[in-house]
Protein backbone atom coordinates (compact mmCIF):
# COMPACT_ATOMS: atom_id res chain seq x y z
CA UNK A 1 0.00 0.00 0.00
CA UNK A 2 1.26 3.44 -0.89
CA UNK A 3 0.82 5.69 2.13
CA UNK A 4 1.15 8.88 0.07
CA UNK A 5 -2.27 10.49 -0.59
CA UNK A 6 -4.13 7.80 1.36
CA UNK A 7 -6.68 8.25 4.15
CA UNK A 8 -5.80 6.49 7.40
CA UNK A 9 -7.65 6.05 10.70
CA UNK A 10 -5.35 5.25 13.62
CA UNK A 11 -6.98 4.08 16.85
CA UNK A 12 -4.63 4.88 19.76
CA UNK A 13 -2.30 6.79 17.49
CA UNK A 14 -0.94 8.88 20.36
CA UNK A 15 0.38 6.05 22.56
CA UNK A 16 3.97 4.89 22.95
CA UNK A 17 4.37 2.90 19.75
CA UNK A 18 1.36 4.73 18.32
CA UNK A 19 2.80 8.24 18.41
CA UNK A 20 6.11 7.29 16.82
CA UNK A 21 4.19 5.35 14.16
CA UNK A 22 1.96 8.36 13.54
CA UNK A 23 5.10 10.44 13.03
CA UNK A 24 6.49 7.96 10.51
CA UNK A 25 3.16 7.78 8.69
CA UNK A 26 2.91 11.57 8.44
CA UNK A 27 6.42 11.71 7.01
CA UNK A 28 5.22 9.37 4.24
CA UNK A 29 2.62 11.91 3.14
CA UNK A 30 -0.92 10.54 3.49
CA UNK A 31 -3.73 12.87 2.54
CA UNK A 32 -5.43 12.44 5.91
CA UNK A 33 -4.44 10.91 9.23
CA UNK A 34 -7.38 10.64 11.61
CA UNK A 35 -6.27 9.85 15.14
CA UNK A 36 -8.78 8.31 17.54
CA UNK A 37 -7.65 8.16 21.14
CA UNK A 38 -9.15 8.07 24.61
CA UNK A 39 -6.89 10.88 25.86
CA UNK A 40 -6.48 14.14 23.98
CA UNK A 41 -2.91 15.34 23.49
CA UNK A 42 -3.02 18.71 21.71
CA UNK A 43 0.77 19.05 21.76
CA UNK A 44 1.22 15.73 19.96
CA UNK A 45 -1.42 16.61 17.36
CA UNK A 46 0.24 19.99 16.79
CA UNK A 47 3.59 18.25 16.36
CA UNK A 48 2.14 15.86 13.78
CA UNK A 49 0.60 18.76 11.85
CA UNK A 50 3.89 20.67 11.86
CA UNK A 51 5.86 17.60 10.78
CA UNK A 52 4.22 17.65 7.35
CA UNK A 53 1.86 20.59 6.71
CA UNK A 54 0.57 18.92 3.55
CA UNK A 55 -1.08 16.20 5.66
CA UNK A 56 -4.42 16.90 7.30
CA UNK A 57 -4.23 15.53 10.85
CA UNK A 58 -7.52 15.30 12.73
CA UNK A 59 -8.27 14.11 16.27
CA UNK A 60 -11.46 12.60 17.67
CA UNK A 61 -11.85 11.32 21.25
CA UNK A 62 -12.63 7.60 21.22
CA UNK A 63 -12.85 4.85 23.82
CA UNK A 64 -12.81 1.42 22.18
CA UNK A 65 -15.03 0.00 24.94
CA UNK A 66 -18.10 1.95 23.79
CA UNK A 67 -20.95 0.05 22.08
CA UNK A 68 -20.61 -0.70 18.37
CA UNK A 69 -23.48 1.68 17.59
CA UNK A 70 -21.50 4.62 19.00
CA UNK A 71 -18.44 3.65 16.98
CA UNK A 72 -20.55 3.53 13.82
CA UNK A 73 -21.76 7.09 14.49
CA UNK A 74 -18.18 8.33 14.86
CA UNK A 75 -17.08 6.51 11.73
CA UNK A 76 -20.01 7.97 9.78
CA UNK A 77 -18.78 11.44 10.73
CA UNK A 78 -15.31 10.54 9.47
CA UNK A 79 -16.51 8.89 6.24
CA UNK A 80 -18.88 11.79 5.52
CA UNK A 81 -15.88 14.10 5.72
CA UNK A 82 -13.25 12.00 3.92
CA UNK A 83 -15.55 10.00 1.60
CA UNK A 84 -13.03 7.13 1.53
CA UNK A 85 -10.73 5.50 4.08
CA UNK A 86 -7.94 3.19 2.95
CA UNK A 87 -6.50 1.84 6.20
CA UNK A 88 -7.73 1.27 9.76
CA UNK A 89 -5.09 0.68 12.42
CA UNK A 90 -6.42 -0.82 15.65
CA UNK A 91 -3.80 0.00 18.27
CA UNK A 92 -5.55 0.30 21.63
CA UNK A 93 -3.99 -1.76 24.39
CA UNK A 94 -3.39 -1.93 28.14
CA UNK A 95 -1.02 -4.08 30.17
CA UNK A 96 -2.33 -4.62 33.69
CA UNK A 97 -3.43 -8.10 34.71
CA UNK A 98 -5.13 -6.66 37.81
CA UNK A 99 -7.75 -5.24 35.41
CA UNK A 100 -9.05 -8.45 33.92
CA UNK A 101 -12.31 -7.24 32.36
CA UNK A 102 -10.80 -4.01 31.03
CA UNK A 103 -7.81 -5.84 29.55
CA UNK A 104 -10.12 -8.06 27.52
CA UNK A 105 -12.43 -5.15 26.67
CA UNK A 106 -9.62 -2.95 25.33
CA UNK A 107 -7.19 -5.46 23.85
CA UNK A 108 -9.67 -7.81 22.23
CA UNK A 109 -13.32 -6.71 22.29
CA UNK A 110 -12.41 -3.16 21.30
CA UNK A 111 -10.55 -4.41 18.24
CA UNK A 112 -13.47 -6.64 17.26
CA UNK A 113 -16.05 -3.90 17.77
CA UNK A 114 -14.15 -1.21 15.86
CA UNK A 115 -13.61 -3.67 13.01
CA UNK A 116 -17.27 -4.68 13.05
CA UNK A 117 -18.33 -1.04 12.91
CA UNK A 118 -16.19 -0.13 9.90
CA UNK A 119 -17.61 -3.07 7.94
CA UNK A 120 -20.77 -0.98 7.46
CA UNK A 121 -18.69 1.30 5.24
CA UNK A 122 -16.26 -1.17 3.66
CA UNK A 123 -17.99 -4.54 3.18
CA UNK A 124 -18.37 -5.18 -0.55
CA UNK A 125 -21.59 -7.12 0.14
CA UNK A 126 -23.07 -3.76 1.16
CA UNK A 127 -21.63 -2.00 -1.86
CA UNK A 128 -18.51 -0.90 -0.04
CA UNK A 129 -15.08 -0.52 -1.64
CA UNK A 130 -13.20 -2.77 0.76
CA UNK A 131 -10.29 -1.65 2.87
CA UNK A 132 -7.25 -2.70 4.88
CA UNK A 133 -6.99 -3.40 8.61
CA UNK A 134 -3.75 -3.51 10.58
CA UNK A 135 -4.26 -4.85 14.08
CA UNK A 136 -1.56 -4.29 16.68
CA UNK A 137 -1.31 -7.57 18.56
CA UNK A 138 1.84 -8.81 20.32
CA UNK A 139 4.52 -11.49 20.31
CA UNK A 140 2.78 -12.71 23.47
CA UNK A 141 0.11 -13.98 21.08
CA UNK A 142 2.73 -16.47 19.84
CA UNK A 143 4.07 -17.51 23.24
CA UNK A 144 2.71 -15.96 26.40
CA UNK A 145 4.48 -14.10 29.15
CA UNK A 146 2.98 -16.49 31.64
CA UNK A 147 3.09 -14.00 34.52
CA UNK A 148 0.57 -11.87 32.58
CA UNK A 149 -1.75 -14.58 31.21
CA UNK A 150 -4.74 -12.26 30.77
CA UNK A 151 -2.81 -9.79 28.62
CA UNK A 152 -1.18 -12.60 26.66
CA UNK A 153 -4.50 -14.35 26.05
CA UNK A 154 -6.15 -11.10 24.93
CA UNK A 155 -3.41 -10.59 22.35
CA UNK A 156 -3.62 -14.20 21.18
CA UNK A 157 -7.35 -13.67 20.68
CA UNK A 158 -6.73 -10.49 18.66
CA UNK A 159 -4.21 -12.36 16.52
CA UNK A 160 -6.67 -15.20 15.86
CA UNK A 161 -9.38 -12.68 14.97
CA UNK A 162 -7.05 -10.93 12.52
CA UNK A 163 -6.09 -14.18 10.85
CA UNK A 164 -9.77 -14.98 10.36
CA UNK A 165 -10.42 -11.53 8.88
CA UNK A 166 -7.74 -12.16 6.28
CA UNK A 167 -9.37 -15.46 5.31
CA UNK A 168 -12.70 -13.66 4.84
CA UNK A 169 -11.28 -11.04 2.46
CA UNK A 170 -12.73 -12.75 -0.63
CA UNK A 171 -16.19 -12.31 0.91
CA UNK A 172 -15.90 -8.85 2.48
CA UNK A 173 -13.26 -7.17 0.34
CA UNK A 174 -11.44 -6.22 3.54
CA UNK A 175 -7.88 -7.47 3.98
CA UNK A 176 -6.04 -7.70 7.30
CA UNK A 177 -2.68 -8.40 8.87
CA UNK A 178 -1.27 -8.34 12.38
CA UNK A 179 1.54 -6.24 13.83
CA UNK A 180 3.22 -8.09 16.70
CA UNK A 181 5.79 -6.00 18.58
CA UNK A 182 8.33 -7.58 20.88
CA UNK A 183 9.29 -5.91 24.15
CA UNK A 184 9.45 -2.22 23.33
CA UNK A 185 10.57 0.57 25.65
CA UNK A 186 7.29 2.32 26.40
CA UNK A 187 5.50 3.56 29.51
CA UNK A 188 3.40 0.40 29.19
CA UNK A 189 6.27 -1.95 30.05
CA UNK A 190 8.15 0.09 32.65
CA UNK A 191 5.69 -0.85 35.39
CA UNK A 192 2.72 -3.19 35.23
CA UNK A 193 0.92 -5.74 37.35
CA UNK A 194 1.18 -9.49 36.99
CA UNK A 195 -1.88 -11.67 37.48
CA UNK A 196 -2.58 -12.15 41.21
CA UNK A 197 0.87 -10.59 41.83
CA UNK A 198 2.58 -13.88 40.96
CA UNK A 199 5.70 -11.91 39.96
CA UNK A 200 5.93 -8.37 41.37
CA UNK A 201 9.15 -7.76 39.40
CA UNK A 202 7.84 -8.88 36.01
CA UNK A 203 8.43 -5.49 34.32
CA UNK A 204 11.91 -5.20 35.77
CA UNK A 205 12.80 -8.74 34.71
CA UNK A 206 11.60 -8.17 31.14
CA UNK A 207 13.67 -5.02 30.77
CA UNK A 208 16.82 -6.92 31.76
CA UNK A 209 16.63 -8.54 28.32
CA UNK A 210 17.23 -6.92 24.91
CA UNK A 211 14.45 -4.56 23.84
CA UNK A 212 13.71 -2.20 20.98
CA UNK A 213 12.82 1.48 20.84
CA UNK A 214 9.44 2.80 19.80
CA UNK A 215 11.10 4.43 16.79
CA UNK A 216 12.56 1.12 15.61
CA UNK A 217 9.13 -0.48 15.97
CA UNK A 218 7.42 2.42 14.18
CA UNK A 219 9.80 2.34 11.22
CA UNK A 220 9.16 -1.37 10.74
CA UNK A 221 5.43 -0.82 11.18
CA UNK A 222 5.48 1.54 8.19
CA UNK A 223 7.36 -1.09 6.17
CA UNK A 224 4.61 -3.60 7.00
CA UNK A 225 1.95 -1.09 5.92
CA UNK A 226 3.75 -0.58 2.62
CA UNK A 227 4.07 -4.36 2.10
CA UNK A 228 0.27 -4.64 2.54
CA UNK A 229 0.25 -8.44 2.68
CA UNK A 230 -3.14 -9.93 3.49
CA UNK A 231 -2.88 -12.48 6.29
CA UNK A 232 0.68 -11.54 7.20
CA UNK A 233 1.74 -12.14 10.78
CA UNK A 234 4.49 -9.59 11.27
CA UNK A 235 6.95 -9.85 14.15
CA UNK A 236 8.53 -6.51 15.03
CA UNK A 237 11.26 -7.39 17.49
CA UNK A 238 14.74 -6.09 18.31
CA UNK A 239 14.61 -3.65 15.42
CA UNK A 240 13.73 -6.33 12.84
CA UNK A 241 10.66 -6.99 10.73
CA UNK A 242 9.99 -10.67 10.06
CA UNK A 243 7.02 -12.52 8.58
CA UNK A 244 5.98 -15.45 10.76
CA UNK A 245 4.93 -18.77 9.26
CA UNK A 246 2.09 -20.07 11.42
CA UNK A 247 2.08 -23.80 12.10
CA UNK A 248 -1.30 -25.38 11.37
CA UNK A 249 -2.23 -28.15 13.78
CA UNK A 250 -5.90 -28.42 12.81
CA UNK A 251 -8.15 -27.42 9.93
CA UNK A 252 -11.93 -27.05 10.07
CA UNK A 253 -12.15 -28.24 6.48
CA UNK A 254 -14.74 -25.63 5.52
Swiss-Prot record:
The subunit structure is: Homodimer.
Keywords in alphabetical order, please. Answer: NAD, Oxidoreductase
Note the Pfam families from the entry. adh_short (PF00106)
Q: Which GO terms describe its molecular function?
A: alcohol dehydrogenase (NAD+) activity
EC class of the enzyme, as a word: oxidoreductase
| Recorded superkingdom | Eukaryota
Q: What is this protein called?
A: Alcohol dehydrogenase
> Which reaction is catalysed here?
a primary alcohol + NAD(+) = an aldehyde + NADH + H(+); a secondary alcohol + NAD(+) = a ketone + NADH + H(+)
Give disulfide pairs as residue numbers: none
KW NAD (keyword) present: yes
The positions annotated for binding NAD(+) are 10-33
Q: Does the keyword Transport apply?
A: no
Catalytic residues?
151 (proton acceptor)
**PANTHER family attached to this UniProt entry:** 15-HYDROXYPROSTAGLANDIN DEHYDROGENASE [NAD(+)], ALCOHOL DEHYDROGENASE-RELATED
Q: Which SUPFAM superfamilies match?
A: NAD(P)-binding Rossmann-fold domains
One cellular component (GO) term of this entry: cytoplasm
Q: Which organism is it from?
A: Drosophila planitibia (Fruit fly)
Amino acid sequence: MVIANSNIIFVAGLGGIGLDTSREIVKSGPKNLVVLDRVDNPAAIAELKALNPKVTVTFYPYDVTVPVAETKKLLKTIFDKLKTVDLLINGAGILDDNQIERTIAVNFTGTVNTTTAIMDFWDKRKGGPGGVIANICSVTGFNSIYQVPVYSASKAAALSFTTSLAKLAHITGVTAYSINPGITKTVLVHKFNSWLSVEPRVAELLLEHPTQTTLQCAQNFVKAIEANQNGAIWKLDLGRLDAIEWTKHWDSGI
